[in-house]
Swiss-Prot record:
GO cellular component: fatty acid beta-oxidation multienzyme complex
GO BP terms: fatty acid beta-oxidation
Name of the molecule in the record: Fatty acid oxidation complex subunit alpha
Lineage of source species: Bacteria, Pseudomonadati, Pseudomonadota, Gammaproteobacteria, Alteromonadales
Record PROSITE patterns: 3HCDH
Underlying gene: fadB
Residues marked Important for catalytic activity (site): E119, E139
Amino acid sequence: MIYQSPTIQVELLEDNIAKLCFNAPGSVNKFDRETLTSLDAALDSIKQDSNIKALVLTSSKDTFIVGADITEFLGLFAQDDAVLLSWVEQANAVFNKLEDLPFPTASAIKGFALGGGCETILATDFRIADTTAKIGLPETKLGIIPGFGGTVRLPRVIGADNALEWITTGKDQRAEDALKVGAVDAVVAPQALEAAAIQMLKDAVAEKLDWQARRNRKLSALTLPKLEAMMSFTTAKGMVFAVAGKHYPAPMAAVSVIEQASTKGRAEALQIEHQAFIKLAKTDVAKALIGIFLNDQFVKGKAKKAGKLAKEVNNAAVLGAGIMGGGIAYQSASKGTPIVMKDIAQPALDLGLNEAAKLLSAQVARGRSTPEKMAKVLNNITPSLDYAAIKHSDVVVEAVVEHPKIKAQVLAEVEGYVSEDAIIASNTSTISINLLAKSMKKPERFCGMHFFNPVHKMPLVEIIRGEHSSEETIASVVAYASKMGKTPIVVNDCPGFFVNRVLFPYFAGFNGLLAEGGDFAAIDKVMEKQFGWPMGPAYLLDVVGLDTGHHAQAVMAEGFPDRMGKSGTDAIDVMFENKRLGQKNGKGFYVYSVDSRGKPKKDVDPTSYGLLKDAFGELKAFEADDIIARTMIPMIIETVRCLEEGIVASPAEADMGLVYGLGFPPFRGGVFRYLDTMGVANFVALADKYAHLGGLYQVTDAMRTLAANNGSYYQA
C-alpha cells in the first residue's frame, strides 16, 4: 500500500501502474475538506515513488464522486474574501498537482462524477466511463460557478461552445453524450471499466497515445480564432441571459469567466475563476440556492427515516378518476407501485386513463421512455367501477370532489372494503382532516395527502396529520409519496393546511390593492419580473380557477375570521360572480386563447377591467415596492405563524413547501431564508408601516422578540 487514509487508498498494480481509490465512509464519495487533504497527501506519496509509471483513479462505490460536500459551503462562504481565496487556491493546488504528475493519468468513471468529481477527472489525461456514468458541473444551480478549475479545463477538453452549455445549464450528461463531445475517451461495460482504463495507460506508457500533447492543450490558451470567439461568446451571453434572467447571476458569470480565461494559460485562467467564484459565493442568491439544496436533503432525510417505521406499500388505489386521479395513478404506476383507479362512472375512468396515457406518450416522444415501458406502466393501472378491486390495497388515496359530505361518505364506504391495516388518505386542499376522520371507524389509519396540480409536474405533497393519525400511518404515507418521486412535508391539520393557509393572505393583499384601484396586470408584472414569482397573483388565480379560489377563500375566512374574514366584495368575488373562472372557461382576469402548440395564451381583456372599475372605481398606480410589500407581508407573517403554532415543523420544511408547492422564487430561498437575508428587524419595521391595513399585516410577539435580539430563523 502506497498510501491509506479513511477516504483514499493507493496501491501499486502490475506494470507499475498505481491505483488511487476513493473510498470514503458512507454510501458515496464527496469532496469534503478531509478528502481534499487526503488527496493532496496521496499525490505527494505517489510523486515520491519513482517506480510508478502511470496512475488510474477509481471509486469503490457505485458512484465516482458526487461533488463537493455542500454542507460545508455556507460556513465557508461566510468567511472573509482572503480566507475564501486561500481555500480556493489550496484546493486548486491539489488539482494542479494531479494534472502535473510526471506520467500519464486516467480516470475510471462509474455513476456520478459531478462538480468536484468532474473537475477531478478533467485534471487527468484520459477519461474512461462505464455505461452508468453521468458527468457534469451543476454549480450554477447553487448560484456559483465551478471552483476547482472546471471553467478552465472543460473548454480546453470539449471546446468553448460545449463547455458553455454544460456549465451554464448545470445538467448531468450521460456517458454516450460525453463521448460525443470528447469529455470521455471511451464508454465501456461496467465490468470492463478498470481494465479498459489500465490498458489505455499501458498504451500511453508505450507511447501509442500522446498523453503529453493532451495535457499541454489543457495548460494553454484556447485555440479559437478571434472572430469566432467573439461570435461564440456574444451568442452565448444572449441565450444564457434569456434563460437565467437578472435574478440568477451565476450562468452569466460563467460565460464571462470562460471568455476572459480563453486567451490565458492555466495559472492566469484559474485566477480569473477564483475571483468570480468568491464574488458569487458571497451573494444572497448563492446562500438561498445552497440553502434550498440543504433543505431538500433535510426533508428527504426525514422521509428516509420515516421509511423505517412505514408499512410497505406494494399495492395502491385512488378513488376518483379524472385528471387528478389519472395523474396520481400515473405517478404511482410509473414509479413501480401498481394502482387501482376506482370511480363510479366509466367516462371518468376513461378520462383518467387517457391522462396517464397522454403523460406517458409525451415521455416516449421526448425519448425519456419507450413504448414497452409505457405499456408496462399502463398495465400497472387497473380501472374499476367496483370497490372489490381495492381489497388488497395497502394505501387508498381518496380523490373525489372537494365536498366534505361526499368525501365523508366515500371514506366511510371504502373502510368496509379494505383490510384492517390498510391506510386511507384524503387528497384534499381545504377540508379539515379531523372533520373527515369523524366518519372513520379507524381514524388512526387515516391522514391527508394533498397533491398539487398538475401531479406529474409539482414536486410537493403535503401529508396532513390529524389528531388521531398514528405515526405508522404518517410514516407509511410519507414513504409512499417518496416512492412516487415526490417531496413530502408533514404538516398538522388546520384550515388550508400549510400551503393554502399561507397563499390566501397573499391573495388578500392582492385583493386589497385592487380594491384601491390597482391594475392586476401591472401587479402581476411586478411580482413576476421584480420579485420573481413564475406567475403573478391574477395569473395564478386564473390557472388555479376562480371558482376554486372563491371556495378556498371562504374556507380560510371561516377558519381565521379575525385576519382573513371579509367585509365586502373583493376582486375574486367579482370574477366568480361574472362566471369568469380563469383558464378553465377561457376568461378570468385575463382572456385565453390557444396558441400554435395547443397551450393557453393570455391577453389583457377590457371586460375584466370594466368589471373591476364598476366595483372599485378608477385605476390607480402603485409603486413596485408598495405592491411587493402589500402582497408579501401577509404571506410571510402567516408562514411565521404556522411555524410558531407547530403547523409546520421547521423553517427548512416551510421553505421547501413554498418553493416546491407554490413556486416561491428559488433565488430568494423561501420565506425564512428571505427574512434572514432581509433581517428580521428590518421586516418588522416594514410590516409596521402597513399594520393599519389589518390583522394580516401585524407581526407576532415572537417575531418582535427575535428582531429585538437580532436573531435569525436559520443557524449559520
